[in-house]
Amino acid sequence: TYNVGLDYGFLDDRITGSIEYHIRETKDLINFIPVPAGTNLTNFINTNVGDLENRGVEFSINAIPVRKQDFSWDIGFNVTANENKITRLTATDDPSYLGVLTGGISGGVGNTIQIHSVGFPANSFLVYEQVYAENGQPIEGLYVDRDGDGQITADDQYRFKKPAPDVFFGLTTNVTYKNFDLSLAGRASIGNYVYNNVQSNNAFYDRLFHPTLYLLNVQSDINEIGFDTPEYFSDHFIQDGSFLRLDHITLSYTFNEVFKKSGNLRVYGTLQNPLLISNYTGLDPEVFGGIDSNIYPRSRTILFGVNANF
């Protein structure tokens, strides 16, 4: 790992922070690779051969805009930009080596939607390029013939986007007025993409005609998509998952000297997950691994509490 950083502070440390550039190389990742015939008892072996590189910049700033006897305000902000790329997956360079299929999805048997490939970000989506009608509706089963051989085969799949964000932001702030205290924390993610597996596995008309003669649930997006059968590998289901999320807001009041002129009592209320702004069509764009199979939204919670110090 290589990094260059700078810590700074101004105005009697009322403004502090840091900036850092890093290059992080991860080596000897395990991969299941082919080996020449006759060199082993099997044609494939598990071995430490993979390399991954991360390059990025991190910036943070903490400030106290107001600091008075009865009123204070502090704020913290950070931003991280990072790019990852796989640099090696086999013992020797092999242009014909496709990569490592990963990212299992619901629908079909053994289907995957992601791949680790040299020269691309980890967990890149491996999909077909969807063709659309003039009205913007995807045309079922019609994809771009990327290799120009006149037919649609696995060779026409391409690596499209990735789950990791390009830029990530964080914000915290706290305002104190006399015995009142208000704090909040939020995050933003830009450039992360999500495979909407809920949509790909539920938004097609054949689900309405089940052979057991009972109705299944379908997504309302079926009206815009219009597929009769599932098209799991269409890039139509790879969607921008950029978001702005407010994690929590907390308001409290502290009663001083309530226990025989000593100690204090703090009463507070917290609203968790109060706000999410995103163009993603699913319930929540913040999913682990970039594959969304979640049919239940993240809960919004209200907490009340009391802290007593003697």
Residue ranges and their predicted role:
Residues 137, 187-272:
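Extracytoplasmic gating/loop element in the C-terminal half of outer-membrane beta-barrel translocons
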Residues 47-53, 57, 64-163, 279:
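Conserved small-residue
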Residues 1-40, 73, 80:
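Membrane-embedded beta-barrel scaffold of Gram-negative outer-membrane proteins
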Residues 15-17, 73-75, 79, 171, ...:
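Transmembrane beta-strands of outer-membrane beta-barrel proteins
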Residues 21-27, 63-65, 79-85, 177-179, ...:
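Transmembrane beta-strands of outer-membrane beta-barrel pores
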Residues 12-17, 57, 68-69, 179-183, ...:
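Repeated loop/turn-to-beta-strand initiation elements of outer-membrane beta-barrel proteins
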Residues 58-61, 78, 298-310:
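Outer-membrane beta-barrel "beta-signal"
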Residues 29-33, 73, 81-101, 191-216, ...:
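Outer-membrane beta-barrel and related beta-rich outer-membrane complex signature
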